Amino acid sequence: MANPGWGLCTYRGADGADALGALRHADGVVVAVPGPRYGGLIAAVAEWDALEQRLAGWEPADLPAVPDAVLLAPLRYPRKLICAGVNYGSHMAEMGAGAPDPDWAAWFFLKPPTTTVIGPDAAIEIDPDPDEQVDWEGELGIVIGRGGRGITAEDAAGHVAGFTVVNDISARGPHRREGAPHDAFRYDWLASKAQDTFCPMGPAVTPRWLLPDPDDQRLRLWVNDELKQDERAGDMLVGWRELVAAASARVTLEPGDVIAAGTPAGVGMPRAQFLRHGDVVRVAIEGIGTLRNPVVTRTRAATGARLAAPRGG
């Protein structure tokens, strides 16, 4: 199918308020969407049925740009940010984990949405200690539009609003801790996955009516224009429908929740390559968009400036 030409986004207007818009991929222009003004996509997705009815068939190609629009993370903020771990066979192989079992099942961890999620061009802040070994993980993000518990894989598509791009930034150094009081505490998921700015997301959400199935879309990631990851999004061990079902078997999914679907081969750890101050990371998924973020060393001044600014990025 032809790649969709736009996605739903959140922008900050000249009045300083968040608003729902549409991002045209061809020229990067933000345009207004018809209907009531929402305070961003997170507010609109709570009324997904009405939004879908209003925008299905709508085309923003010839609309004027919103003046002085600043693009933010599309969802500010998901109630839950659920991340699938080890969901590509190629990534398992490069990490020395062997081949997946035939009955491989999904497993998940969580990131705190309000402090990890940043938007396009916002800075990924990393600790200056090189032993942190901060890595990249380009991923497909599944955005929930209709909530539920115990959703079947067959019904999952009807609960999905659309798809976005996620970068699951990961600190490899502190992930495994020595001297843990029990095997259950050997891995420090807070230090590894949940640090501030460790979940760039965006630039927009492609509605599912424009991209019914992302499986054939190409997922790529570059660091400083060097291609690191390149794989078909649908090469997941557990498909996106099954991920929705597996997550909803444990928790109630709510509109605006995001499930990050795991990363393919090409991360830095097996090659001893990690992010450094001044790097620029780009993640692109065909039909969804390109997410770009610079990398900066975390300093007290930089963190203070980010926290003092209007929330999000």
Residue ranges and their predicted role:
Residues 34-35, 165, 232, 292:
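Short clusters of small/polar residues that mark proteolytic maturation junctions
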Residues 2-47:
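Gly/serine-rich nucleotide phosphate-binding loop at the start of the catalytic core
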Residues 12, 22-24, 135, 143, ...:
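Well-ordered beta-strand positions
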Residues 2-4, 15, 91, 125, ...:
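Catalytic-pocket segment enriched in acidic/His residues
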